[in-house]
C-alpha cells in the first residue's frame, strides 16, 4: 500500500477561515483519509472518502444535525492522506482511529474481542475459554457473544467429557478423577486414542450435534438406575436437561452448519444502531447491539463500523450477511454477501427490524431519563433557590479514627455521573485535624485549582455531612472569594438520605418518591462509594508497605518493585527464593525477604 500526503499538508495549521478555504480549494479528486483537528492541534475525527475533495468540503457547506454541527464548530485545521484505492483508505482509517482514538470516532474504541472455546493441543488436553486465537494452540470454536455464554458451554463440556481440569498435572489424583470427570493422567498413562475419542465427541457437541450425547447419557442414566445408583442417575438426568436447555436457546437454524454473522442497521438523524446475529454451525447463539452518533452518511458510517469490527476480529466467520448497499470495498477484505432471496435474506431482514426496535427503545429510554434528570435538577434547584442547576460536585471524607484520611469528589452533569471529573484527595495531616478541617482543606484545594486554571465552577456543592462540614466548605470558599451554593445531605438513623440542609441551616425535605430525592440519593451513595474505595486502597497499600519495612536491603524502591511484580503481599509471602530473584531483587535482598516471611515456618518445623 502506498499512502501519499496531499499538498494540503504543507500549509501550517491555522484557525483562520481564509487559510481553511485555501486548503479546501487544493483538495484532490482521489480516495484517501482526512484528519480533523481542533485549535490545539488535537485530532478529533478521522474519516475516509472515495473523493477527498467532495467529502471534506461537505463539512463546510450545507446544513447538519446538532451533533455534527458541534464537531464542525471545533475544526480549526485538517490534514488529508491520499491512497491508491478505497480499500486502502478504509484500512488506513481503521489504523488511524486505533492510533489516535479521536473524540468523535467512538466506534469500537475499546477494541472489543469475543471469547472462544478451545480444546487445547496439549498431550493431556483441556477445555479453555480465551479471547486470544493462537495458531497451533488448539481447535477453536466461536466466537461467543459474551463470556457468560462461553463459560456456560465450557462448564457443560467439562461435565460431559473427562478432559484434564488442572493447570499442572498434580502428584496425586484430584476430586475430578474420583468423580469420573478426568481420565487421571496423574494416576495412569492415558492413551492418545482416549483423548482423540473425547475430542471428537466434544467437537460434535460444539458443532450442534447433541443427539448422540443425549442417547449416551440416557443409556447411562438407565444403567445407574437399574444398579440402584440413584444419585448418579440424577446427575445424568440433570446433564441431559442442561443439554436440552442449550439446544432450546438455538432456535433459529440453517441446515448447512456454516458459521456466519448476520448484520442489520437502523438510524435516526444523528444515531446509528447496528445489530449482529451470531450463527455458529448454522444455529443462532446470540446477538450484539452497537448504538452511537455518526458524522457522515449513515451508510458510510455503517461500512466504517464493519471494517473496524472485522479487522479487529480474532477469527472471521465463513460468511457475513448484509442488507442491500454498496459493499464492493468490503468484499475485497471480508467474506461479505448481500442475499437476494430465501432464509438468508429473511435473517438479514430480521436483523434490520431488531436494529430498528432497539434504536427506538434506546431513544425512548433517553427521553425518559432526560425528562427525569431535568425534573430532578429543577426540584433541587427550587428547594435551594438555584434557578439554573446543571453541575453538582459532591465531597465525602473517609477515615478510621482519623488515620489514612482521604476525600472523594464526584461530579454530576445534567443529572448524570461525569466520571472524567471525579477526583481523589489525600488529606494533608495538620494539628487537630477532624472531618470539618479536612473538608475545609479539600474544598480550598479543589477550587483554588479551578481558579488558577480558569475553569468553570459548579452550580452547587453537596457535602456528605451536616452543619459543621457545610460551614467549613463555606469558609474555604470565602477565603477564595468564590460564590458557590453549598448544601449538606442529611441522613436518618438508618444511614439513608433523608433531606437537604442549606447554608442558613434550613432543612429542605423532598418527597422520597420524587425525581429530586432519587438523584440526591444516587449522588450520596456514589460519593460514599468512591471515597471509601479510595480509603481502602490507601489503607491496604500502607499495610502492605509496612509489612515490608525493616527488611535489610529492601528500601522504598524495592518495596514498590516487589508489589509491581507480585501484585499483593500474599503473593510475596508465598514466593520461593527463585521467584523473589526473578522479580529483579539481588540475591542478598531476595534471601532477606524470603527469610523474613519463612523464618517462623522453619522454627515451627524445628520444634
Swiss-Prot record:
A Pfam family this chain is assigned to: UvrC_RNaseH
Positions of the GIY-YIG domain: 29-106
GO cellular component: cytoplasm; excinuclease repair complex
Domain UVR: residue ranges: 211-246
Family annotation (InterPro entries): GIY-YIG_endonuc (IPR000305), GIY-YIG_endonuc_sf (IPR035901), GIY-YIG_UvrC_Cho (IPR047296), RuvA_2-like (IPR010994), UVR_dom (IPR001943), UVR_dom_sf (IPR036876), UvrABC_protein_C (IPR050066), UvrC (IPR004791)
Cellular compartments annotated: Cytoplasm
CDD domains cross-referenced by the UniProt entry: GIY-YIG_UvrC_Cho
Gene Ontology MF terms: DNA binding; excinuclease ABC activity
Subunit structure: Interacts with UvrB in an incision complex.
Protein family: Belongs to the UvrC family.
Function: The UvrABC repair system catalyzes the recognition and processing of DNA lesions. UvrC both incises the 5' and 3' sides of the lesion. The N-terminal half is responsible for the 3' incision and the C-terminal half is responsible for the 5' incision.
Protein name stated in the entry: UvrABC system protein C
Annotated source species: Desulfitobacterium hafniense (strain Y51)
Gene: uvrC
Amino acid at each position: 500500500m502506498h499512502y501519499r500526503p496531499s499538498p494540503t499538508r504543507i500549509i501550517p495549521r491555522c484557525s483562520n477561515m481564509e487559510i481553511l478555504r485555501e486548503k479546501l480549494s487544493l483538495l484532490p479528486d482521489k480516495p484517501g483519509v482526512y484528519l480533523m483537528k481542533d485549535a490545539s492541534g488535537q485530532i478529533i475525527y478521522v474519516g475516509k472518502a472515495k473523493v477527498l475533495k467532495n467529502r471534506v468540503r461537505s463539512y463546510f457547506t450545507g446544513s447538519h444535525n446538532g451533533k455534527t454541527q458541534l464537531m464542525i464548530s471545533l475544526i480549526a485545521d485538517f490534514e488529508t492522506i491520499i491512497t491508491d484505492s478505497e480499500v486502502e483508505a478504509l484500512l488506513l482509517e481503521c489504523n488511524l482511529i486505533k492510533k489516535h482514538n479521536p473524540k468523535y470516532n467512538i466506534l469500537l474504541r475499546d477494541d472489543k474481542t469475543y471469547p472462544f472455546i478451545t480444546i487445547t493441543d496439549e498431550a493431556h488436553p483441556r477445555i479453555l475459554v480465551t479471547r486470544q486465537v493462537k495458531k497451533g494452540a488448539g481447535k477453536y470454536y466461536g466466537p461467543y457473544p459474551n463470556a457468560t455464554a462461553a463459560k456456560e458451554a465450557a462448564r457443560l463440556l467439562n461435565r460431559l467429557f473427562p478432559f484434564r481440569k488442572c493447570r499442572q498435572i498434580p502428584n496425586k489424583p484430584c476430586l475430578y478423577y474420583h468423580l469420573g470427570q478426568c481420565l487421571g493422567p496423574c494416576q495412569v498413562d492415558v492413551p492418545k486414542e482416549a483423548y482423540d475419542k473425547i475430542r471428537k465427541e466434544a467437537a460434535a457437541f460444539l458443532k450442534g450435534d447433541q443427539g448422540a450425547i443425549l442417547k449416551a447419557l440416557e443409556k447411562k442414566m438407565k444403567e445407574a438406575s437399574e444398579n440402584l445408583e440413584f444419585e448418579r442417575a440424577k446427575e445424568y438426568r440433570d446433564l441431559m436437561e442442561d443439554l436440552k436447555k442449550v439446544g432450546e436457546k438455538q432456535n433459529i437454524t440453517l441446515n448447512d452448519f456454516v458459521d456466519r454473522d448476520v448484520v442489520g442497521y437502523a438510524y435516526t438523524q444523528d444515531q446509528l444502531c447496528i445489530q449482529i446475529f451470531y450463527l455458529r454451525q448454522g444455529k443462532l447463539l446470540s446477538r450484539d447491539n452497537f448504538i452511537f452518533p455518526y458524522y457522515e452518511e449513515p451508510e458510510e458510517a455503517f461500512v466504517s463500523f464493519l471494517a473496524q469490527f472485522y479487522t479487529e476480529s480474532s477469527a472471521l466467520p465463513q460468511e457475513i450477511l448484509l442488507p442491500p448497499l454498496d459493499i464492493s470495498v468490503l468484499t475485497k477484505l471480508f467474506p461479505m454477501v448481500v442475499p437476494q432471496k430465501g432464509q438468508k435474506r429473511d435473517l438479514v431482514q430480521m436483523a434490520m427490524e431488531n436494529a430498528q426496535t432497539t434504536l427506538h427503545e434506546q431513544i425512548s429510554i433517553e427521553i425518559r431519563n432526560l425528562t427525569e434528570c431535568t425534573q430532578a435538577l429543577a426540584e433541587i434547584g427550587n428547594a435551594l433557590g438555584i434557578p439554573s442547576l446543571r453541575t453538582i460536585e459532591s465531597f465525602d471524607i473517609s477515615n478510621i479514627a482519623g488515620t489514612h484520611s482521604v476525600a472523594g469528589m464526584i461530579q454530576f452533569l445534567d443529572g448524570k455521573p461525569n466520571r472524567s471529573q471525579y477526583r481523589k484527595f489525600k488529606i494533608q495531616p495538620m494539628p487537630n485535624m477532624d472531618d470539618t478541617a479536612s473538608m475545609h482543606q479539600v474544598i480550598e484545594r479543589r477550587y483554588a485549582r479551578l481558579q488558577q486554571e480558569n475553569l468553570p465552577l459548579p452550580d452547587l456543592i453537596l457535602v456528605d455531612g451536616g452543619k459543621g462540614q457545610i460551614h467549613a466548605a463555606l469558609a474555604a470558599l470565602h477565603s477564595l472569594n468564590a460564590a458557590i451554593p453549598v448544601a449538606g445531605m442529611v441522613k436518618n438513623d438508618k444511614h439513608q438520605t433523608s433531606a437537604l440542609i442549606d447554608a442558613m441551616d434550613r432543612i429542605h425535605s423532598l418527597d422520597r418518591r420524587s425525581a429530586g430525592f432519587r438523584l440526591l440519593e444516587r449522588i450520596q451513595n456514589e460519593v460514599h462509594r468512591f471515597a471509601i474505595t479510595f480509603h481502602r486502597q490507601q489503607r491496604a497499600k500502607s499495610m502492605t508497605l509496612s509489612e515490608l519495612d525493616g527488611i535489610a536491603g529492601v528500601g522504598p524502591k524495592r518495596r514498590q518493585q516487589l508489589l509491581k511484580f507480585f501484585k499483593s503481599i500474599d503473593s510475596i509471602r508465598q514466593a520461593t527464593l527463585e521467584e523473589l530473584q526473578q522479580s529483579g531483587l539481588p540475591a542478598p535482598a531476595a534471601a532477606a525477604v524470603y527469610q523474613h516471611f519463612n523464618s517462623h515456618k522453619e522454627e515451627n518445623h524445628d520444634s
